[in-house]
Amino acid sequence: MFTMKKSLLLLFFLGAINLPLCQEERNAEEERRDGDDEGSVEVQKRFFPLLFGALSSMMPKLFGK
């Protein structure tokens, strides 16, 4: 009986440790996935003003105004 309690206690302990580790890994993966979306938005924010600035400086040269 004592060995059965001991092994059940060990299983409970290992399960209790394993659960938070899995949750941390899942949260890190979700943050990594969410971070990719934010990075692409930031790249778009940086790219479009540069593109519009370059086009506005080239337009007068192209049309001779």
From Swiss-Prot:
UniProt-recorded name of the protein: Temporin-LK1
Tissue: Expressed by the skin glands.
Protein's UniProt keywords contain Secreted: yes
Propeptide: 23-44
Residue ranges of the TM segments: none
Phenylalanine amide found at: F63
Keywords: Amidation, Amphibian defense peptide, Antibiotic, Antimicrobial, Cleavage on pair of basic residues, Fungicide, Secreted, Signal
Function of the molecule: Has antimicrobial activity against Gram-positive bacteria S.aureus ATCC 2592 (MIC=2.5 uM), S.aureus ATCC 43300 (MIC=2.5 uM) and B.subtilis (MIC=15.0 uM), against Gram-negative bacteria E.coli ML-35P (MIC=30.0 uM), P.aeruginosa PA01 (MIC=2.5 uM) and P.aeruginosa ATCC 27853 (MIC=2.5 uM) and against fungus C.albicans ATCC 2002 (MIC=5.0 uM).
Family: Belongs to the frog skin active peptide (FSAP) family. Temporin subfamily.
A single GO BP: defense response to Gram-positive bacterium
Keyword Signal: yes
Lineage, opening ranks: Eukaryota, Metazoa, Chordata, Craniata, Vertebrata
Signal sequence, renumbered to the chain: 1-22
Compartments, as annotated in UniProt: Secreted
Cellular-component GO terms for this entry: extracellular region
